[in-house]
A protein has these predicted regions:
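Non-catalytic accessory regions flanking glycosidase/transglycosidase catalytic cores in CAZymes
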Residues: 60, 71-131, 197, 239
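Short, conserved secondary-structure segments in the cores of folded domains
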Residues: 2, 34, 51, 83-84
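Soluble periplasmic/extracytoplasmic beta-strand elements of cell-envelope proteins
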Residues: 4-7, 43-45, 54-56, 93-95, ...
Length: 282
């Protein structure tokens, strides 16, 4: 992989030729089109294909992947210009592998998605995701799940090999995280039991891989109650082979003040859950 800084007179074609790449690949990898004008000083990622395959009549993504002992998911990842589409055209040129790109390690990638996300955008990112998390299942104070139209997202995630996480939050239909709903649930053992039973039923019915717990604006005095609730979820779900992730607000210190932060005790929640997701976008 190269980082090319655009100079006067550079074009996508000349840059691609300089690095033994293809203009269409350079454009797609940098969020450009072949007609996008370049700007002097602009930095572009350029990847040099090691092996190329030109699509012939009758070939499919699956057959090509099989010929090179690759998964369809890997082939899609290596050809971002496809944007997740599986329909190939005769003459399409695919990168089978790239030069000088040894694996650096492993990385788990999760993305939240609203049920109304556009299909083209969803399909373009799914090959790169480890997990897809439809947003969100809210709760009532009595421990009843608010429904979520997640069927399309779950179907697409399964098609592209991404595991699905069920997202549990205190978000209300009005779009606000409810401190009141969180407090009512965390102080009501019967409501927690009802919610846990419904979560297990929903996950089994819809094929969810795990659970992401995202309670925000929890009253500070319920810090330990929240951690105990997450622990209770983990124990029940782990028994079914399902992990529990706790979403944490970003903090600069354990003493950080504010309703968003104080009940998110990093030490307690990291022990209560199987993993944590640090919401640095907050």
């Amino acid at each position: 992989m190269h980082i090319h800084v655009v100079k006067r007179g550079d074009t996508l074609s000349s840059i691609a030729a300089m690095h033994d790449a293809l203009p269409a690949f350079v454009a797609a990898d940098n969020g450009l089109t072949l007609s996008t004008p370049l700007v002097i000083g602009q930095a572009l990622v350029v990847r040099t294909p090691k092996t190329l395959h030109t699509v012939r009549v009758g070939e499919t993504l699956s057959s090509i992947a099989r010929d090179y002992d690759l998964s369809v998911r890997t082939l899609l990842r290596r050809n971002f210009f496809l944007h997740g589409r599986e329909l190939l055209r005769e003459g399409d040129v695919l990168a089978i592998d790239y030069a000088d790109e040894a694996p650096l390690g492993t990385l788990g990638v999760n993305a939240y998605a609203y049920p109304y996300i556009g299909g083209e955008l969803l399909d373009s990112v799914l090959p790169y995701l480890t997990y897809l998390t439809p947003f969100t299942y809210g709760i009532t104070p009595a421990g009843v799940l608010a429904p979520l139209d997640d069927a399309r997202l779950l179907e697409r995630a399964a098609r592209y090999g991404a595991k699905s996480l069920m997202h549990l939050s205190t978000l209300t239909p009005e779009g606000n995280f409810s401190s009141e709903n969180a407090a009512a649930l965390l102080q009501n053992d019967r409501a927690q039991s009802a919610l846990l039973a419904e979560i297990l039923q929903t996950m089994a019915k819809k094929g969810y891989y795990g659970l992401d717990v995202d309670f925000e604006y929890v009253p500070p005095e319920l810090r330990e109650d929240y951690a105990a609730f997450v622990c209770r979820l983990r124990e029940a779900l782990n028994a079914e082979g399902k992990p529990v992730v706790a979403a944490l607000a970003p903090k600069t210190s354990a003493q950080q003040r504010g309703l968003l932060y104080e009940a998110h005790d990093y030490a307690l929640l990291s022990k209560a859950a199987n993993a944590v997701f640090l919401m640095t976008y907050e």
